[in-house]
Swiss-Prot record:
GO BP term, example: tRNA modification
Species, as recorded: Helicobacter pylori (strain G27)
PANTHER family, alphabetized: TRNA DIMETHYLALLYLTRANSFERASE (PTHR11088:SF60)
UniProt-recorded Gene Ontology molecular function terms: ATP binding; tRNA dimethylallyltransferase activity
Uppermost EC category: transferase
Sequence segments annotated as region (Interaction with substrate tRNA): 9-12
Transmembrane segment boundaries: none
Site (Interaction with substrate tRNA): 73
Domain of life of the native organism: Bacteria
Subunit structure, as described in the record: Monomer.
Protein name: tRNA dimethylallyltransferase
Catalytic activity: adenosine(37) in tRNA + dimethylallyl diphosphate = N(6)-dimethylallyladenosine(37) in tRNA + diphosphate
Taxonomic lineage of the native organism: Bacteria, Pseudomonadati, Campylobacterota, Epsilonproteobacteria, Campylobacterales
Entry keyword set: ATP-binding, Magnesium, Nucleotide-binding, Transferase, tRNA processing
Matches recorded under Pfam families: IPPT
Length: 276
């Protein structure tokens, strides 16, 4: 398949996280152009808007007939396809100030409810990501988020994207995850995270990712090596299940099949001139 690859993975976008992200090696990338890898420093934030910008850039410069968007964050993909509102432009200093403000809140959801009941109604009380994003907008604009979004409506994604998902038998998937975890530990996962955790702020976004957060618990002597392996495996299996459910329920026209079937379907779609 003559294609280029766009990584929609919220961990592979970071420099220096190679083992925890199972990032393609430089050798693997040598003959195939990859986008959105090694783009951010550890203490920088990723979000759907950033991936949308990088994806549009990749689509503009890609010389191949097929651009495969792979990974990663189905939530980001859904956000990009449905459209994103322009976010407030704020300086690095303001970001730090806003983060401090939010960190002082004893119950961010209750506070959101008090300043914007309409927005709070749309967000589950456990959805910390969306609560945080809503509060960022409030502190940056001094406007209730629902009013901000009314004034800044979503802009639909301007390109046609075909959606494909790999179907893997449950036991095979679990065995793959177990082996992947073993390989990561054998390749130096703990050493990789130790070097980064001592160098960057403890609240950096990638430190919350599966594989990373458990390694930090091990470094803090809160998990044994055996527990580390078991916890990464268990959390990854749960994530795979959530992603599978999300993909099935949140995307229309999703083609699901084996590797061979998906490959055939992508090639068939590419002949009709669709990138994706």
């Amino acid at each position: 398949m003559d294609a280029e690859i766009f990584s929609l993975d919220s961990l592979s976008i970071y420099k220096d996280i190679n083992i925890a992200s199972a990032k393609p090696s430089l050798k693997e990338r040598k003959n195939i152009k990859h986008y959105a890898l090694d783009y951010l420093n550890i203490d920088e934030k990723n979000n759907a808007q950033l991936f949308k910008t990088l994806l549009e850039d990749a689509m503009r410069v890609s010389s191949k007939e097929i651009l495969l968007i792979v990974g990663g964050s189905s939530f980001y993909l859904k956000s990009i396809l449905e459209g994103l509102s322009d976010t407030p432009k704020i300086s690095g200093e303001e970001v730090v100030k806003i983060e401090r403000e939010i960190a002082t809140l004893s119950n961010p959801y209750i506070f959101l409810k008090s300043i914007d009941p309409n927005m709070a109604f749309k967000i589950h009380s456990n959805d910390t990501y969306r609560i945080h994003k809503a509060l960022e907008i409030f502190y940056a604009t001094h406007t209730p988020p629902s009013e901000y979004f009314k004034a800044n409506p979503k802009k639909p994604f301007a390109h046609a994207i075909s959606l494909f998902a790999l179907s893997v038998e449950k036991n095979a998937l679990h065995n793959n995850i177990k082996q992947r975890t073993k390989n990561m530990l054998h390749s130096g996962l703990i050493e990789e995270i130790k070097a980064l955790y001592t160098q960057y702020p403890k609240d950096s976004q990638p430190f919350k990712a599966i594989g990373v957060k458990e390694s930090i618990l091990f470094l803090e002597k809160r998990l044994t090596l055996k527990e580390l392996e078991e916890t990464i495996t268990s959390n990854t299996i749960k994530l795979a299940k959530r992603q599978n459910t999300f993909n099935k329920t949140q995307f229309n026209n999703l083609y699901t099949g084996s590797v061979k079937e998906v490959r055939h379907a992508i090639l068939k779609h590419s002949k009709s001139g669709i990138k994706g």
